[in-house]
Amino acid sequence: MCKAKVLAIIVTYNPEIIRLTECINSLAPQVERVILVDNGSNNSHLIKNIIINNLEIILLSENKGIAFAQNHGVKKGLEAKEFDYLFFSDQDTCFPSDVIEKLKSTFTKNNKKGKNVACASPFFKDHRSNYMHPSVCLNIFTSTKVICSEVDDDLYPSHVIASGMLMSREAWRVVGPFCEKLFIDWVDTEWCWRALANNMIIVQTPSVIISHELGYGQKIFAGRSVTIHNSFRNY
């Protein structure tokens, strides 16, 4: 059986170059191709100087939003018609060396159970506070949050964040691209909900827990943990 090939998409906007390079280096050995789409960064002249064998850099002239950049990268990459999976990353997450294999295994395991998997995702832990971001399942009446441990079984949330998401090419064909009317927030959530509407499932596996930073950390407000984002994202 031929090895399933993975196309990784990284979207950047004014990234820290050292951290971005670490992110790319953590992914490049695990996938067949990395496409970086920059959304009109002030330091794009530094981004284009990053040289890694299987990396292609696309510099956009302006910031058209994360959905546009992700879709642009996927469209460019799928011209080759050789990839089975798409992997999405932000600009500052460094991934463990086995993240792709573990997420592909999650796909295989669940598909063998007769589940129609759209995407598989890891869990994230904020290393500053040791806060484990929960798996979230929404319905009309309630919101259920589950904190995982490494020994737990896979969970099936209503949505996951795009960074760290491994998506099948078939899911991309069936569900369609990300909604470009949404600039930053809700892009990944809206796509996941469309996947569910197409009778596909979202899988979150505790076999992969990634250390990262989301916004400026967590604050307790009215008894709930709230993520504090930077002013650019808010306004």
Stretch-by-stretch model annotation:
Residues 98-134:
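Conserved donor NDP-sugar-binding/catalytic core segment of glycosyltransferases
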Residues 137-158:
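Short, flexible, basic/aromatic active-site loop/helix in glycosyltransferases
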Residues 165, 171, 175-176, 181-208:
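A short, conserved alpha-helix in the catalytic core of glycosyltransferases
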Residues 10-29:
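Short, well-formed alpha-helical segments that are part of the catalytic scaffolds
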Residues 83-94:
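Short beta-strand-to-loop acidic/aromatic patch adjacent to the donor-nucleotide binding site
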Residues 201-235:
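Active-site-adjacent helix/loop segment of glycosyltransferases
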Residues 38-47, 62, 93:
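A conserved acidic beta->alpha catalytic loop
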Residues 61-78:
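Glycine-rich, basic loop-to-helix element that forms the pyrophosphate-binding segment
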